[in-house]
C-alpha cells in the first residue's frame, strides 16, 4: 500500500473523469461520493455496513467533533479512525461552514472566528491554525483549508471580500499544515456565482499549491441552474492532475450533472437524512414510504436493487416500521439510499471508462422520468 497521497486519472469522456486517489489507508475510486459521518458516525449505520455499500471514504466534521467529544479526546483515544472503527480514508471539513450556519454570536476578524457553541453556549475560537491543529488531532487523511462561507444572497462586493479573506486563510492553512507525508490538504475555491471571482480564487489557490482543490460556496440555495452555470467553467480553472471536490452535493441529478462537468468528489447528508425521514432514492426517483399507497404493497422499493432493504423487505413492511417509529426503518432506508448512491457512482465510473457516459446519463434521466411504479 502506498505511503503517500497521489491521484491518477485513468479515463475521460468529455469533461468527465475517472481515476484513483491513493492514500496510506487505501484507494478512493473517482468519481466518489462520500457519506457524511458528522459526529463520528454515519447515522443509523455500522461502519462495516457503510463500507459494504461501496464507500471508499467518509467525511467527518471538525466543528461538531471539536465541541463534542473534543479533538483532544479523540487524539488521546487513538484518532478518529480507531475511535469510530473505520480503517479507510477520512476527509474532515474545516469547520468554517458550520460556524457560519450553526453557531451563535459569531465574531469574524482577519484572525478567525469567535463563536458560541450551539450545544451549550460555550465560547470557542477557530482560525486557520486551530482548524489545522484539530484536523491533525483527529488524524484525517484529507484536510480542508479553513474558509469563510458567506450567506447567500449577498452582494458581489461582499462575496469578493469573503473570497479574498478565504484566500489569505488558505495560505495560513498551508503554512500551518506543514509537511505531513501521506496526508493531503485541499484548498477551497470561493467566489459565489461570479466567474471573475472564481477565476481569481482558483489562481490564488494554484499559487499556494494544494494536493487537491474543492469548489465551495455552492449548493447553498442558489438552485441547480446557477450551480451548473458555475460548474460549466469552474473546474477548468483548477489543475487537471489534482482531485476536484464539490462540497455539499447532493441530489442524484446534481451528482450526475457535476460529474459531467469534471467533478471527482462529492459529499452530502441527503441519503442518510432522507432515510431517517422516510424518503428513499431509487432509479425511478424518490419514494415517500410514509404514503398510505405502500401499506399493502409486497414489492421491494426497487426490484433491481441488491441492498438488504430491497432484498429482504417489502414496501409494506418499511411503511409499517416507519409509521411505528421503529429504529430499523432508519437503518434499512439509510442503507438503501447509501447503496443506491454508491451504485450510481459505480455506474458513472464504468460509463466514463467505456466512453459511454452520454448513454448512461440518458438512461438515468429516462428512468427518473418514468416515476415510481404504479400502485397496486
UniProtKB/Swiss-Prot annotation:
Annotated cofactor note: Binds 1 zinc ion per subunit.
Region of interest (RNA binding), ranges: 248-254
Cofactor(s), names only, from the UniProt record: Zn(2+)
Pathway(s) served: tRNA modification; tRNA-queuosine biosynthesis
GO annotation terms (biological process): queuosine biosynthetic process; tRNA wobble guanine modification; tRNA-guanine transglycosylation
Residues holding substrate: 93-97, 147, 190, 217
Keyword flag Transmembrane: no
InterPro entries: ArchSynthase1/Queuine_TRR, TGT, TGT-like_sf, tRNA_ribo_trans-like
Keyword Manganese: no
Catalytic activity entry: 7-aminomethyl-7-carbaguanine + guanosine(34) in tRNA = 7-aminomethyl-7-carbaguanosine(34) in tRNA + guanine
UniProt binding sites for Zn(2+): 305, 307, 310, 336
Enzyme Commission no: 2.4.2.29
Pfam families: TGT (PF01702)
Chain coiled-coil ranges: none
Highest taxon of the lineage: Bacteria
GO cellular component, one term: cytosol
Keywords, in A-Z order: Glycosyltransferase, Metal-binding, Queuosine biosynthesis, Transferase, tRNA processing, Zinc
Active site per UniProt: 93, 267
GO terms assigned for molecular function: metal ion binding; tRNA-guanosine(34) queuine transglycosylase activity
Top class in the EC scheme: transferase
Family indicated by similarity: Belongs to the queuine tRNA-ribosyltransferase family.
Reported function: Catalyzes the base-exchange of a guanine (G) residue with the queuine precursor 7-aminomethyl-7-deazaguanine (PreQ1) at position 34 (anticodon wobble position) in tRNAs with GU(N) anticodons (tRNA-Asp, -Asn, -His and -Tyr). Catalysis occurs through a double-displacement mechanism. The nucleophile active site attacks the C1' of nucleotide 34 to detach the guanine base from the RNA, forming a covalent enzyme-RNA intermediate. The proton acceptor active site deprotonates the incoming PreQ1, allowing a nucleophilic attack on the C1' of the ribose to form the product.
Subunit structure as annotated in this protein's UniProt entry: Homodimer. Within each dimer, one monomer is responsible for RNA recognition and catalysis, while the other monomer binds to the replacement base PreQ1.
UniProt protein name: Queuine tRNA-ribosyltransferase
Organism: Cereibacter sphaeroides (strain ATCC 17029 / ATH 2.4.9) (Rhodobacter sphaeroides)
